[in-house]
Design a protein with these regions (language model features):
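Metal-cofactor-binding active-site regions of metalloenzymes
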Residues: 1-174
Length: 174
């Protein structure tokens, strides 16, 4: 009988801010000096969908809890690294991670710094766990188009292939 858990997998649509483990949420909350529930079940209810969600906006509201946790380069690097660790344990060998860097600029981190931090975490995860991890940078249609353009043109002209080699094709505006 085929055991799906033993098969290697690819993950083609994974959002960084929706993929934090409870352990990393706890670390990030401590780093950000944010109080969170002590019990895992109570914390899980704040960051997970339970049952039917009535609207997209109700679903997206879950991300409001996570956003303040991803406002530093250290936090973003840790989140990206932990995501690769998590999927490696599920036998994922390739992952495309979606990330909207402008959501991590509330504390003066720039978009380029946010992307760089995520790439550092993904690259460390690749090296440590053997998972090919690519970043799909998303621009949000309700925010400043100039920020997305800046990142796009930086990606096209960057002399640093280390920074941009793992960004997939173009920047996506969602």
């Amino acid at each position: 009988m085929l055991n799906v858990n033993e098969l290697v997998k690819t993950e083609l649509h994974c959002h960084l801010d929706g993929s934090l483990s409870l352990g990393v949420i706890r670390q990030l909350a401590q780093m950000a000096k944010i109080t969170i529930p002590a019990e895992d079940e109570a914390l899980r209810k704040l960051v997970s969908v339970h049952g039917k969600v009535d609207s997209l906006m109700a679903y997206l509201k879950l991300f409001d809890f996570v956003r303040p946790l991803l406002q530093t380069a250290t936090a973003l690097e840790l989140a990206a690294y932990d995501l690769v660790r998590q999927v490696a344990s599920d036998k994922v060998i390739y992952i495309e991670v979606r990330f909207a860097p402008e959501l991590s600029t509330d504390q003066d981190l720039t978009i380029l710094e946010a992307v760089s931090a995520v790439l550092v975490g993904l690259n460390r995860g690749q090296e440590d766990f053997g998972v090919v991890a690519k970043l799909l940078v998303c621009g949000l249609k309700q925010t400043n188009t100039n920020q997305t353009k800046e990142l796009f043109f930086y990606h096209l002209s960057s002399p640093s292939r280390y920074l941009t080699k793992n960004i997939l094709s173009s920047i996506v505006k969602i």
